[in-house]
Amino acid sequence: MKWIGLTGGIACGKSTVSRMLRTHDIPVVDADEIAKEVVKPGSAGLKSVIQEFGPEFLTADGALDRRKLGQKVFGHPELLHKLEAITHPLIREETRRRRRLYEDMGHKLAIYDIPLLFETRAKDQFDGVIVVACTKEQQKERLRRQNWSEDEIEMRIASQIPIQFKEQQADFVLHNNRDEQHLLREVDRVLKWLEELKNQN
């Protein structure tokens, strides 16, 4: 089974593209979804995170306050490393399980929706990489609409590898810098490319 990475800069529209691909019966494994699952209430992952960082990162209903924890660790490499040392092995294990499941079902191709594909040096694990790209100003505007502060926006964008580098490293670049009709046409281009990949030995 071909294993395709889907990534992009924050707020470039990767999740929207991921949803569109699902509607075409392409199996998608979502790294963010798995990252939430491995620290859900009652999980061993959540217990380990709280032991490391403290109970102030729990919400009133016992869930992990991901935004509060994110604000603490971003910009502090040693804290981010501690968090990733807990969560990354759990995420990898669950990812492998889902990938095997799709393979056992007979799929020829599956997508792994992973925001930090290049940051985690994972490119070599894939048979192809799709990058969803937009301009920096569009990233900022979309994050403002989600009520992010200017400091949060600057810090998060700065923590990621520049989108231009990701575009250079990609096997396929999908531009999400115009309207929805343009995005639909871009997704059609991706679907054709995936079909070609699927039929390669």
From Swiss-Prot:
This is Dephospho-CoA kinase. It is found in: Cytoplasm. Signal peptide: none annotated. It catalyses: 3'-dephospho-CoA + ATP = ADP + CoA + H(+). It is an enzyme of class 2 (transferase). It comes from Bdellovibrio bacteriovorus (strain ATCC 15356 / DSM 50701 / NCIMB 9529 / HD100). The keyword Heme does not apply. Belongs to the CoaE family.
